[in-house]
Amino acid sequence: WKVGVHRWLLSPSGEYAIDYVSSPSTPRDIDLIRVKDAKVISTLLSAPDPFKLYRMPRIKVGHILAADGKTRLNYRLTLPPDLDETKKYPTIVYVYGGPKVQLVTGDWQNGARGWDLYMAQRGYVMFTVDSRGSANRGHAFESVIHRNLGINEMADQVKGVEFLKSLSYVDADRIGVHGWSYGGFMTTNLMLTY
């Protein structure tokens, strides 16, 4: 069984499935699976790394504690390719923080977007943390924002900024925040509250 994020498309008979699998280091494999024993019948596609010939940003993932002091939050740092930890870099926090979305994933490049890669190539540190209220961590994790928008998830993002300020290469005087949709709400709220 391949490690990574799997998305299955089941055949009408239920006997076979197409398995789209991706991991931090594998862009995409597409396999035909026999459902009864989960055996790979055929690999239909094994996508090569499209960035293999390029000097790409480094992606680091890890955990910080939420504002409640006990919940582990997943984060992703996208770092300039030639990061020098003795220098200070401007940093952008990309935030969503709302329901039904997970930004730090176990698939290709841990879910880093083209924007993250682009900005890191230009000398920015890019940071994302999935605060409480985001998807795929269970009901209790997701429901802390129910009828309580802009409180717990904001406090978690502030914990993320505190973590960033502890890193030797982050310029604490040049940290920006960016988001769209619920992330736009979070961005505005963070700017006006903190």
Model-found features: residue ranges?
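Serine-hydrolase catalytic core recognition
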Residues: 5-194
